[in-house]
Amino acid sequence: MDHAADRHRTDLMTITRFVLNEQTKHPESRGDFSILLSHIVLGCKFVCTAVNKAGLAKLLGLAGETNVQGEDQKKLDVLSNEVFIKALVSSNRTCILVSEEDEEATFVRPANRGKYCVVFDPLDGSSNIDCGVSIGTIFGIYMIKDGHEPTLDDVLQPGMNMLAAGYCMYGSSCTLVLSTGSGVNGFTLDPSLGEFILTHPDIKIPKKGKIYSVNEGNAKNWDSPTSKYVQSCKYPADGSSPKSLRYIGSMVADVHRTLLYGGIFLYPGDKKSPNGKLRVLYEVFPMSFLMEQAGGQAFTGKQRALDLVPEKIHERSPIFLGSYDDVEEIKKLYAAEEQN
């Protein structure tokens, strides 16, 4: 490749250009959604820089506070949360923000208010910060139900009502994966340009994968269908090769690998945590939305994940998501359990 020539290319598909192209498909659009996405992208760039400098800037370690989930807050968590709140409010396109780090939803003051609700986890996998494992930001976007004064009901909607969802992974490269409801596309940050470039157009998850991803440390507390499924991954009844176990412990990294290579990601409910650990609004819904848009499935153990109607902003749910055929297998095990 001629890197010197590549440096001067201006025909690259940047995320801004991509979003504007999508906007032209909706003649009635006023550009509000594009402006909101540009502010989310800016927040991701800012957090990416902070993550890269974290060790040098002494941002690692605890901030001495705990968040609503009872988890110790990292300094980077606090910073990332502030970055996204400010970026979203300053877009003048949002009315309600729900963050994993804040106990209450943030209602934007009327002067800065728009028609979108954004749910987000500013820094998922933050327990991995100190050891350099990939971490990320997860987000989902809803529109308020109508022109009334915004209430919590505007965010307590089923995942299938989401307009867009995505995540930004801060790892060996900074990758932003986005769906606006018509497929999934991946963008990689070019540090020399400061731009996200389309590198993974129209991502489709393989129909069946060779990898399963689950925390087996919880195995003694699993229900029967989960135990049977993991057993079948290790010892297939048909004598075929077993699936490989890959588990990082950072949802963004585990789901990203599942999306690209196929397979299944599981965070089941168990005796200790019947509702699982992952939060519905800003973890389960965005990742399930992306999986379905890429041709996969997402299941809670009882129903399609995107059909869930949350009652609280920090509600949790079990989740099984990934390749269509792999999720279909665990759905059959739960169906058989129900019949017994």
Curated annotation (Swiss-Prot):
Mg(2+) 3 binds at residues 121, 124, 283. The keyword Glycoprotein does not apply. In plants there are two FBPase isozymes: one in the cytosol and the other in the chloroplast. One of its GO terms (molecular function) is fructose 1,6-bisphosphate 1-phosphatase activity. Mg(2+) 1 binds at residues 71, 100. It comes from Solanum tuberosum. Signal peptide: none annotated. This is Fructose-1,6-bisphosphatase, cytosolic. Its main location: cytoplasm. Its EC number is 3.1.3.11. The keyword Cytoplasm applies. Keywords: Carbohydrate metabolism, Cytoplasm, Hydrolase, Magnesium, Metal-binding. It is found in: Cytoplasm. Substrate binds at residues 124-127, 215, 247, 267, 277.
